């Protein structure tokens, strides 16, 4: 991965009820920002952040919206390589393992059921295919500074979701 082009994108989604009001957030951390230890508070000024909401939604749709919006931002910055850090195994395994089978099976699961959130998976796949992406999983609510920042921003967005317009389908 080209260190000069690499951005680290932390993402998170939240839903108050499932389904219910949902929020998503990402933090874009340039490669020149110093590493933060577990438990340190991530200064919002050290990262570019964005959040949005949808109502009604689900936690999985919000996780996907967070990554889609983060990758759109990376594309807008002409990034060639990114690291995506998510606490969602659904997103990480979906994009690195399951999606290949879904596409091969005509967007059906191994159980022959339609893939949920196909619209978002297709959007994510197109964005990810245009970049060099390294996918990392981090345990949620375990003190990772930027994961905690995204969690807070996504939860705040979910709280506002009932009064706002949707930022992601």
Swiss-Prot record:
Localization, UniProt: Cytoplasm
Catalytic activity: Endonucleolytic cleavage to 5'-phosphomonoester
Keywords, in A-Z order: Cytoplasm, Endonuclease, Hydrolase, Magnesium, Metal-binding, Nuclease
Entry keyword annotation includes Plastid: no
A GO molecular function held by the record: nucleic acid binding
UniProt-listed Enzyme Commission number(s): 3.1.26.4
Enzyme class: hydrolase
GO cellular component, as recorded: cytoplasm
GO BP terms: DNA replication, removal of RNA primer
SUPFAM superfamilies in UniProt: Ribonuclease H-like (SSF53098)
InterPro entries the UniProt entry points to: RNase_H, RNaseH-like_sf, RNaseH_domain, RNaseH_sf, RNaseHI
Domain RNase H type-1: 3-159
Record's protein name: Ribonuclease H
Organism: Treponema pallidum (strain Nichols)
Lineage: Bacteria, Pseudomonadati, Spirochaetota, Spirochaetia, Spirochaetales
């Amino acid at each position: 991965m080209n260190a000069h082009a690499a951005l680290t994108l932390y993402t998170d989604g939240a839903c108050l009820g499932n389904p219910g009001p949902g929020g998503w957030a990402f933090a874009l951390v340039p490669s020149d920002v110093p590493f933060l230890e577990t438990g340190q508070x991530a200064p919002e000024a050290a990262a570019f952040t964005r959040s949005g909401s949808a109502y009604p939604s689900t936690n999985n749709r919000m996780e996907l919206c967070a990554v889609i919006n983060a990758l759109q931002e990376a594309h807008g910055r002409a990034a060639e390589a990114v690291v995506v850090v998510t606490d969602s195994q659904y997103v990480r395994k979906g994009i690195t393992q399951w999606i290949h089978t879904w596409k091969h099976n005509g967007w059906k699961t191994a159980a022959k059921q339609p893939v949920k959130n196909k619209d978002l998976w297709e959007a994510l796949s197109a964005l990810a295919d245009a970049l060099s992406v390294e996918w990392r999983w981090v345990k949620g609510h375990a003190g990772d500074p930027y994961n905690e920042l995204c969690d807070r921003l996504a939860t705040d967005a979910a709280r506002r979701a009932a009064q706002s317009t949707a930022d992601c389908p």
